[in-house]
């Protein structure tokens, strides 16, 4: 049996929560299981690791960085807007932005999902639509909280893959496919540092990658949901882990 301790070490950013009145940081099982099934070893990254001296010690130990989805939203002031964000998680913002900047500099692979994509957009100088529901010309991209979870994560709309990017290289035989949709915010302005990898039928950005980086991919949908059952989701996670293995080999050559 393969020794999981030999697998690429994937740092997973945690999310703020409360448990019986205590400040807590959590991760949902589906995000962790998707990494394990793809051949990675996930480790939880608490927000205190944003402290620069700790982050500097942490980064050489990571072979990849994984930014999962979350009920929280990125604070508006980080992309130049005013107003409060009732569902903010400042600790996650601080750690995610620091990790993204460090990973881009050190060429550490990144896989970002939902909120993670939005963090990638903001960290590279872009901005977000804060309330998609106020734009009637758009599809409904939020989940229905009254439905069972299995139905909330069911395919909701198609995405069209842009040619010539990372996503089309991972999925060369699949230029469009159906995805789930569980988000109320979205990329608004995308930095020139990013390539738009896919769009929904209403034109919204559904995937981005960082130009001139070996693997820094963000997707707006949730491929972690039952990832081992869907070939397209498996390909994305396995592509991420393969990139992490290449990063290990590159570190060993230096």
Task: Annotate each PLM feature.
Residues 1-111, 121-129, 133-171, 178, ...:
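N-terminal beta1-alpha1 cap of cysteine-dependent amidohydrolase-like domains
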Residues 114:
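Conserved G/P- and acidic residue-centered "switch" motifs that form tight phosphate/ATP-binding loops
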Residues 217-220:
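Active-site-proximal beta-strand elements of phosphoester/diester hydrolases
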